[in-house]
Amino acid sequence: MPEKRLSAEPPEVTEEEFENYLATDNFLVDYFNEFLSLPTFPEAIRFNVDYGVFEVVNDAPQLLEKQLKKILQNQQPRNPIYDVVRKGKSDSKSTQKSVPCEDEAINVNYSIMCLKREQGINWIKRERLPAFLESDCYFEYRLAKLISQATWSSTGMNFIVGTNFTPWILRRPPAPPPPSTDEDNYMIMKKFYVSLGQASYTQTKDWFTLAKESENTVTMASLPCCIPHHQTASPVIATASEIFDDGVHPRTIKSLSKSSKAVSELDEEEEGSISMKDSPSQALLRVYLEKKGGKERNLTLHFSSVEEFLDAYIIFILREAIQHITGQSLSDTPEYINYYKVSHVIFDKVPPVPSNKAIVSPPVEMVEEISKDRLENVSLSSESESIGPESRADWCISHRTYDIGNRREFERFKKFLKGTLGERYWWLWMDIERLKVLKDPERHQRHLEKMKKCYLVSSGERYLSAEILSKFKLLHGSRWTADHLKNIQAEVLKPLLLYWAPRFCVTHSASAKNASTELKFWRLRQEKPRKDVDPFPQMATLLPLRPKSCIPQTPEVQGEEINLFQPSKFKKLSKINAGTQQLGRSEPLNAVSSKDGGLEKGSKRLPESTTVVRLTSFTDISECLKPQLERKYTYTEEHNVKTVSNVGALGGFDMENLLQSLYVENRAGFFFTKFCENSGNKLWKHSVYFWFDLQAYHQLFYQETLQPFKVCKQAQYLFATYIAPSASFDIGLHQEGKKDIYMKIQPPFEDLFDTAEEFILLSLLEPWTQMVMSDKMAYKKVELQEETRQLDSACFRKLHALHKETISKKAEDTTGYAMAKLSLSDVSKQTEYWLNVPEGYKHFTFTDLLNNKLEFEHFRQFLESHSSSLDLMCWIDIEQFRRIIFKDQKQREEKSIYIKNKYLNKKYFFGPRSPASLHQQNQIMLLSGGWGRILHEQLDASVLVEIQKHVLNRLENVWLPLFLSSEQFASRQKIKTQMKDIADELLLQRHDRKIGVWKPVESKWISSSCEIIAFRKALLNPVIARQFQRFVALKGDLLENGVLFWQEVQKFKDLCHSHCDESIIHKKITTIINCFINSYIPPALQIDIPVEQAQKILEHRKELGPYVFREAQMTIFGVLFKFWPQFCEFRKNLTDEKIMSVLERRQEHKQKRKASDTEEDKAGKSGVKQYASTTGSLTKPVLGSESLLVLQSYGRQPTWCYSKYIEALEQERILLKIQEEVERKMFTGTSSFTNLLKPSTGSALSLKKNVSLHSIQR
């Protein structure tokens, strides 16, 4: 029978390891979130395990899901079974489906406030963690981790419990002391076989620096085949005490070597102890070989799945058979693996066990598939939910195993123990845990006395038999000491771990699942607690036995529903209770909605009046009370649900919150009790003690059989300890109250101490208010930031599917499954992907995509169609981060935080769709300092580089071959080269002018090398350069400066080649920068280059050296080159003597026209009285300009040009339009409109005549 070692030592969470546990242990996340949501704390916080951030509790997801369900129910057709009795009335309507209108965009986004990561972690450690480590939530978490070790197997399993085996401690080898510098240098010289001889100190130091850098360089090779590799890691783990070597994620490696025990395949299958990972691995199939004594033994094989191993092993067996028959050796092939030398096999992928032991939650697709037709079980939280208990039980049955691997199963186990002997072991273990953290001697002794009354005395509520007490050596009261109880705690755990937990697992076996009705009924009776027969049955009391002021009220659940059809903004949300909890007397213990409990979108802090009080769905209030306070039956129930306004007058809302806090004080780590103790006020401390002891007194009235002697004894104890004049814990009750209680103490009833209870509750209001205010003040120091989340809802997916009636449901489901499967493809199948790529495209690499903007855009769209664009976006963002200047720390920090929040969470990189395997994720987080670093704002740059490598690996080996083998890519490659060049030319006209996502254009505008040479020679020719300079001056304001800049840079290059003094070169650089890039004359940038290039030149002028102006000169060259063909056409019709005169004439005409336009703008703003002068100012410059052009052309041979004639007509049209616009604006509606119109018309006619005359002369 297989054996399994179990630990009796629970995990120990410390402040140093808290972040690592929180990032990896879902058990701890569940219990810590329950702790943070208790009514004791005014701010309800929860840890989102998917995003690794603490967030303010928000009910928006629940409200959204509720409305989605309502919409879906309204749009689904009515079941035809309801139309049986209504035949003929609604036949046409019975199967009609109300399809939602496509114009109505259903908004599933919601906003949530999150604590800033660094500040939030520090605040949690300082204000919440100490109390959590002393709370029942933490104790129960420790017990749950121990119980989760128990598993069930159909073939049986032998458990061995020990305290020297701790699977949850992160085993880290002690760091060796750093070697001395001399020893380190000696080892490097020995490794490289180098003797430095007569080298100087500087040369020696530089050489050692380079040698150390070469040692630290890691080469990442991406190979598509199985490669033998010599294992350099530590030897194979063989002993059972080292099975859980990473301390967090259990991984067992079964070794078949001589030093380890031989375990059968059935053992490995049933025990589940073969090494496996919880998420699909993206690693290559690699073989790690360990050398021992020069023989190739202990070969390690890594496979992505069991199926892949079986295929490879069957092929090996067939080859061996063929070799035996034919006599030909097949071991010479490179892919040959000798399985006779394999010591153990590691599987990177198995069907995901729905257990919270793993870092990665179950795949989203599996959860969606299971909950597709069960709307009531849809996950409403933003974090990844585990599979439901029934589904998980079905999965375990199909795999012939079962364990208590998550919080939900653990809660079922607690219910299974109700009324059994296992429950007594449970509470004894918990009481020992409580005893261990009590430091106050008085409270320590009081707790010991209560334990004796509960377990040792025969009338105790959880009395243990003499046999059990004798086994634990607790028969005598003197043995009930803290040290002895600590020593026997492991023995108390053994019955739970070795009997009750396996028995619970057995109930989920296949035989029990398929049992007959009688057997199921019998099993149900066994799970229920036994009820003792009461010979004197009690009568239900109709009136309450306690004042309303001492009972937590139940407000109505109020809240505004979120409109799903609004763009993105939400209204204020009223706080809603997380769930209805039951007190010992079956009174729901809910939160009190605050008057101003809304959280506005965009607000950075919660209002002071906001009080979020809630209990989680896992909290059982009957177990939150002390063991003596658990009430089995409720004889007094108030069926009237009270509203907020119905709260008793005693204290109002503060009293309600105080009562709720007191009822869960032990699960909150006695947070309020410690505040009262540390305040120094004895009355506050005594009042808290009295309230807890009073609940034990009330508990006696809710047992099945009333025991008058115990009631009388407890009443006398309370009176003597807290109320009597000489009481040791006097609560300060007034004399009349003491006398009244003394007169009614015989016989005692439940309402005997109601007066004292109201008195202490009123007195405790003051410390409660002080504690809440101080906690709020500390919380206000933490900065909040708003984040937008999207609800992952099956209802929304169904609604979205209703819009696509043309696509069949079956085809849609197949497509979705194929996409999900494709996005989670194994990297081990890289060879298959590349085999499907045509031979002509196999040379295509990811770098080629980056250099081809058109195909890069198609590749991005291809990934989006397969819902995998995150891979490319992640790679691009990290690449942009790497290219940010190191000195710009602020920008690098912002980009790093952005990458961390968007990609490094359990929705992508650390989730089921991660491009890295679980082992690779562990290596990356160990490189960053542990899994706790995921809770911080950013990771180191080296970690981001490693992440980028894994993302690039999947892009190159999975998505790129799929893209190259697609039909769309093949059809695009058949297009002519000329059409491709045109497409590239059009893409260059984009504003960013970048070929990739981050780097500038690489000479895509150049058509031929001959034209480049001709243009460069022209710019170096003083005459042609001067003509070209005047020509481009007509095209743009800064183009003329571009010619000068290009020439000055050429002179700077010649200066660098002359090997002159460095100061002269730096002076030249400064001159060029001051003239063209950072000019004192506005604008500062005098040439047509991007601002980013200018900024780079200013910041890196020293680092770039002689190449400081290289990119700027290339950009200017490209801009000017566009005008070179036009200039060549212009020179054809003119001689060299006439070129400058024509260009100067055009330049002067351009300046005059600009001045004319300026005057026209000024004239348009003038009043009616200044019309005549305005009209003159509009026409005179133009006429003067035209007459000047006539005089300048006088005496020359008149020529006529069609282009000039068209230009003159265009000018005439513009001037007439301006004139008409001025007239319409200035004189509409005036009495003198007709008289004033005549001179303006004459001016226009004269202007037209002059322009026409000038055109003819030209």
UniProtKB/Swiss-Prot annotation:
It is found in: Cytoplasm; Nucleus. PROSITE patterns: RGS (PS50132). Disulfide bonds: none annotated. One of its GO terms (biological process) is negative regulation of signal transduction. Residues 845-973, 1014-1138 form the RGS domain. Residues 1154-1164 have a biased composition (Basic and acidic residues). Residues 581-604, 1145-1172 are annotated as: Disordered. Keywords: Coiled coil, Cytoplasm, Nucleus, Repeat, Signal transduction inhibitor. Gene3D superfamilies: Regulator of G-protein Signalling 4, domain 2 (1.10.167.10). InterPro entries: RGS (IPR016137), Rgs22 (IPR042651), RGS22_RGS_fourth (IPR048074), RGS22_RGS_second (IPR048075), RGS22_RGS_third (IPR048073), RGS_sf (IPR036305), RGS_subdomain_2 (IPR044926). GO terms for molecular function: G-protein alpha-subunit binding. The keyword Repeat applies. Expressed testis, including in Leydig cells and spermatogenic cells from the spermatogonia to spermatid stages (at protein level). PANTHER family: REGULATOR OF G-PROTEIN SIGNALING 22 (PTHR46583:SF1). Interacts with GNA11, GNA12 and GNA13. This is Regulator of G-protein signaling 22. It comes from Mus musculus. The lineage of its organism: Eukaryota, Metazoa, Chordata, Craniata, Vertebrata.
